[in-house]
Amino acid sequence: MNIKKYYILIAEGVTDCSLLEAVLEQYLQFSSFAKVDELPEIFKNMIGIYPSGLGELKRTDSPMFYYKDVIGIAVKQANGCNNLAAKASALIEIIDQLDVYDQFGGFLLFGETEDEIKTLLTRTFKERDFDYTGDVIKAYGHELTCKLHLLPSSGRGAIEKVLLKCVEKSYDTLTKDAENFKMVVMQPEYADIRKKCWAKKDEIQEFYADKVQFEAISAVLKPDRPVRFAIKDKIIRKEYYDLYMQIPDFKKVYDFLVENLKCVEE
């Protein structure tokens, strides 16, 4: 397999990553690598391991790996907005060790819409002696492309806001019933549960309410399975492509990937 360009997509959580993976698979015709032996060296170095040297049994996370023609892609979970720059910084070390700067196409970072995210990225990279300005990271005498996409693209919220727009078009009745359920659990009778299980602040409870609605939909579409399976198996499907392209935030994600993953259309 002759991979000439590598890209690394880093998103905040499993839901974000699942959406990106599904778009790559369903709408951009990328295939996932099936075996470790098939992976390019840079991707092999990103595979999670059990940190036995520390006496721990918790395995570090592994990305999903994809290819199409001469393009190789890793999709990695950051586990929170605060970790986007930290994950990218750790991967820069791998790029530097293998000296694959010429083959590296860049980082694509995906975060929730927050006013402070760009400042946070700049500060975290600087703590690691990397200079992040605009769409570029300066590291070890090299300039690496690093572009940020926010989901949703305006206002406050999480990736679930975009996904709820999708299921409104593909599963309308289910979405309405799930919204009714959300309204029920936002009533005063559930205030104690929300404070104990979600958050104490009302604005954060509103943030989690979208997640509850989407997870209710997911539980119907893929019972007894994590949310990622509903996204990849039931929501992001080829037959819904035209419907989803009518959703501005979804189309922006699609366009951002096409624009920045060079050779996708070649």
Residue ranges and their predicted role:
Residues 7-15, 113, 151, 155, ...:
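Conserved aromatic-histidine-acidic binding/catalytic patches
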Residues 1, 94-102, 137:
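Surface-exposed acidic, glycine-flexible loop patches that form ligand/cofactor-binding
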Residues 1-93, 124-127:
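Domain-level signal for Mg2+-assisted phosphodiester chemistry and nucleotide/NA-binding surfaces
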Residues 233-266:
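Charge-dense, extended regions
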Residues 105-106, 110-222, 226:
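Activity-critical C-terminal alpha-helical subdomain
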Residues 8-12, 76-77, 102-116:
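Acidic beta-strand-to-loop metal/phosphate-binding motif
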